[in-house]
Amino acid sequence: PLRDTHPHLTMKNQTFHLQGFVDGLRDLTTTERHHNAYGDPFTTLSPVVPTVSTTLSPPSTTGDPALSPEMSPSSLLGLLAGLQVVYFLWTKIPTIAQNLDWWWTSLSFPGGIPECTGQNSQFQTCKHLPTSCPPTCNGFRWMYLRRFIIYLLVLLLCLIFLLVLLDWKGLLPVCPLQPTTETTVNCRQCTLSVQDTYTPPYCCCLKPTAGNCTCWPIPSSWALGNYLWEWALARFSWLNLLVPLLQWLGGISLIAWFLLIWMIWFWGPALLSILPPFIPIFVLFFLIWVYI
C-alpha cells in the first residue's frame, strides 16, 4: 500500500508540513507590516517637512534620577569625620586648656611656678600646682576663670577661622548691608561679562547693565587681606611660589582638612624623627611641581 511505500505522504506528515508553511507565511507577513510601519532600512526615505502643531504637549520630565533617601558615601564620610572631630575636641581641648593655663600662669612667675600650699580656714589640702587646684582650694576660682577665658579665646579663633574660610569660598555675602544709594562700583569681578563665572570673593551684583553689574563694594576685611598680600609680594618675591600651593590647599574640602589635622595631631610628634631626611626630597618635588 501507499502508506507503507511512501510514508512521507501520510496525513500526519502533510499536516505537519502544512503547519510549518503557515508559520513561515505569518512571519513573512509580520516582517512586511513592520517595514511598512517603521520603514525599510534598504529604501531611501524622503525628507520630512517640519510642521508646527497647534496643540502643545506637556514637556516630558527628563533628567537625573531622584536621589534615594539612603545615606550617600559622601554623607557617611562627613558623619564619620564629624564624629572624629567631636572625639578630638572632647579629649584634647581640656589638655590644650591646661597647657595654655600653665603658660599663662608662667608669665607671672618668670623663675618658675611655685607650689600652691592650699591653706584654707575650713579645708586642709596637700601641696599642688596653681594650674590644678582642687575645688576646696582658694585658687580654684581663679583657675576656673582662666580656663573660661581660654575657652572663649579658642572659640573665637575657631569662629574667625570658619568665617574666613566661608568668605574665601564665597559662601558668605560680601556686603551684608545694602547701601542706601545704588552706585556702580568697579569691582574686579563685576567688570567681566555677565555670562562669565565669577571667582571668589563674589561681588554683590544688583542688576546687569551693559555687560557690567551694579555692585556693592567688597568688604574691608577682604580688601585688607588683599592689600597685605600685595604688600608682602612686593617685598618678598619668593611668595609667588606659594600661590599654586595655596590654591591647591584652598580647594581641599573641609572634611579633608579635619582628617589632616587629626593625623598631624596624633602622628606628628612620632614623624618628626622620621621626616627630616626626606625634607630635601619634598622641596625638590615641590620645585618640580611649580616649574614643570
UniProtKB/Swiss-Prot annotation:
The chain crosses the membrane at residues 76-96, 148-168, 241-261, 268-290. One of its GO terms (cellular component) is virion membrane. Glycans are attached at N212. Residues 11-70 are annotated as: Pre-S2. Residues 1-10 are annotated as: Pre-S1. InterPro entries: HBV_HBSAG. Keywords: Fusion of virus membrane with host membrane, Glycoprotein, Host-virus interaction, Lipoprotein, Membrane, Myristate, Transmembrane, Transmembrane helix, Viral attachment to host cell, Viral envelope protein, Viral penetration into host cytoplasm, Virion, Virus entry into host cell. The large envelope protein exists in two topological conformations, one which is termed 'external' or Le-HBsAg and the other 'internal' or Li-HBsAg. In its external conformation the protein attaches the virus to cell receptors and thereby initiating infection. This interaction determines the species specificity and liver tropism. The large envelope protein probably also assumes fusion between virion and host membranes. In its internal conformation the protein plays a role in virion morphogenesis and mediates the contact with the nucleocapsid like a matrix protein. This is Large envelope protein.
